[in-house]
């Protein structure tokens, strides 16, 4: 059987060796170039390929059309991925005739994602394993071919557990590869209800937070000990790395992080005590815990913890300027930032109905105003604040055809001023791009870094919003490249939830789809399905969206700098008609149903009669969220039906309270 292999790490070497022994014909191997900044403790796929005279490549982008075509020309019957670090696009997965298969270091569906071995140890698991499964566009979600369990011992570290998993992988492949070659393959779908997803780990994730239980901290130590960067804490500003530890169940009345004894070196935790068996001071040697204490001058009663200079810096709250704070995203984001306690929010908008509940909060400062008029106030606050979010825009489809020039003036021209102020004062801008920039893209899912942005002809005015946003994206990107602007672009995909638009805005046609449909139910008018409602969208709960946006603001390890990030839920894909049917069912079952008129039925309307001349629709809009998973460790969790129910309840409660309901 002819195969193409994507491989890295020891598991990659193991997979290639197993394929050769099973009689597979490896036509090409794709791997990664060694990272000089990485502690490479594992075998080299490139060296192994050289020893076996196998062609090996390390392309910058294996999903580039040129590489896809080269792989297609090889006509492989199967693809195998063994710890290859990049996602393969559907165009590659569709090439082999037998299928594409991945070897994942956990017992799927648990621990999908990155660094599963480290995460299992962090979480104190007693068992993990290895899974051979079909590859799909969604990471680690394909049907299972075979699995082999691995027991995790109390003294296992990431290195020893990796060795166990490698041996299990070898045994599993020796058993399954001959079957697969003979066509004897049995697939078991994954149970999505048991799925869990974990993102990549960074060295910063190794910080020891002493208020946690000692057992958790011990698990962290063994999860990231050598050859990984290690768990760490600080004595003042001096870093100490913990390479080996024990945990004790004994309790202490001392504050977490307090030194209880020097020899042995024991630290009070939120629950129990952690004993540092071996460690290393920054710039020092690997030594026993007692010697480490002496080198750092640690004595009983002292405290260790966060870096002292960082703690002083964090005493000042991060100042966030939100223009359009009263809008759907703005008011929900304000709530999340104030709940966190580490942020001071400055907001401007032409109204305050959605943020009145924050007035009086010591960390919320609101001014009523228009961004096209209050330019001096805006420039001053951009200079004053740390993070800028210009959320002001016209984002309702009917306005794209009804008021195209106003859309351009506000969405592009006014926001360009904000961008230039951020350049002038060297401020970080988090700019709301839009899923609309993808236009009529023909990809199965829209990728921030490779999908084409396809729009219609000039006489279709509805694209003025899309191209205004796209042009700003390009301007921001250029400022980042040429003048060092610190930016992140985020692209929301059909966020829904309470406080989305208003029924009044729906009455004049200036609202999103679900608000318009709810108005039809409240008023007892037919639900209008534009062009039959066949258009598909991926609906995202506002809570999921705001959590992702909050993590962009947090920007751990500066991961989001210079990035474009889709924020959507690809699993919540449905047509407008399907959404309307779910909405109707929830409306009929709602406790307030009797306050409103009978359902008036569905009415099919043409887009031209609803939106006017110049409208053109999009058949589907499905995001790739690989960037969000990788950069934010984020995964949407809320199903569409729950979101629809919450949105409906908000509007019905409001209608009853204000007396809008049917008499």
From Swiss-Prot:
Gene Ontology molecular functions: carboxy-lyase activity; UDP-4-amino-4-deoxy-L-arabinose formyltransferase activity; UDP-glucuronate dehydrogenase activity
One GO cellular component term: membrane
Record site: Raises pKa of active site His: 140
Task performed by this protein: Bifunctional enzyme that catalyzes the oxidative decarboxylation of UDP-glucuronic acid (UDP-GlcUA) to UDP-4-keto-arabinose (UDP-Ara4O) and the addition of a formyl group to UDP-4-amino-4-deoxy-L-arabinose (UDP-L-Ara4N) to form UDP-L-4-formamido-arabinose (UDP-L-Ara4FN). The modified arabinose is attached to lipid A and is required for resistance to polymyxin and cationic antimicrobial peptides.
Protein name stated in the entry: Bifunctional polymyxin resistance protein ArnA
Stretches for region Dehydrogenase ArnADH: 316-663
CDD domains on file: Arna_FMT_C, Arna_like_SDR_e
Domain of life: Bacteria
Pfam families, per database record: Epimerase (PF01370), Formyl_trans_C (PF02911), Formyl_trans_N (PF00551)
Catalytic residue list: 104 (proton donor), 436 (proton acceptor), 621 (proton donor)
Similarity comment: family membership: In the N-terminal section; belongs to the Fmt family. UDP-L-Ara4N formyltransferase subfamily. In the C-terminal section; belongs to the NAD(P)-dependent epimerase/dehydratase family. UDP-glucuronic acid decarboxylase subfamily.
Site entry: Transition state stabilizer: 102
Originating gene: arnA
Enzyme Commission code(s) on record: 2.1.2.13, 1.1.1.305
Record-listed UDP-alpha-D-glucuronate binding positions: 395, 400, 434-435, 462, 494, 528-537, 615
Residues binding (6R)-10-formyltetrahydrofolate: 114, 136-140
Spans annotated as Formyltransferase ArnAFT: 1-304
